């Protein structure tokens, strides 16, 4: 079944945000993106030092379409991708972050676009599909919001929708330690070890367990691939999920 999505602008009258989000075809980064990336990288390395352990970003495919899907534990998580993610990444960000016109303008320059987490935001989905149709690389957090515990929450079905509809390759990413570095409700970070691990890029198989291939089943499959990258204490609802034995790998 094909889902009809509106072709309207990405958002309604957010001060500082362009009426139509500029999705670029050439993979270049704006000066705002470069400046924020440098700030993120310098801040994280300066504060956490060798405690910040990241897999080689050379595992990122140079071209899309690519869905980069990660579990979400802390507000530090997007900073890591902003500072160390190679090339240009696009990212869905909660609409509340765009309440300030200046912040909204900066986020737009960093390839971030708003999503309303309280509803099925079709405009955000349309923008995400536009990014992927132009062979872009889109970062999305699996659970849609920060987990209140280290263990993974169930994936949002929208992740499965984007994977199915776009046909993009998928890069699973696992992060842990950020929940201790900047817990929910805290304003100042703590110096603790942080680990980010990249999994192998894969494509959706033709069949899923039980013959299911709906949005939630696809999202759960991606969740199980992320869980494989995490220590057992962080796998949450995916601790006992059976993963298909073989998924066609692109790497």
Predicted features and spans:
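Short, basic, glycine/proline-bearing loop/turn elements
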Residues: 40-43, 109-115, 142-146
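Short, well-ordered coil/turn elements that cap or connect secondary structure elements
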Residues: 47-49, 86, 104-109, 165, ...
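Catalytic core of membrane glycerolipid acyltransferases/transacylases, capturing the structured
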Residues: 62-119, 127
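Short hydrophobic helices that act as membrane-entry/anchoring signals
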Residues: 30-48, 104, 108
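Non-catalytic C-terminal accessory region of glycerolipid acyltransferases
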Residues: 2-28, 123-251
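A conditional alpha-helix N-cap/helix-loop micro-motif detector
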Residues: 50, 118-122, 152
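Helix-to-loop junction immediately C-terminal to a conserved catalytic motif
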Residues: 40-72
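A generic local structural motif
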Residues: 39-40, 51-57, 76-78, 125-127, ...
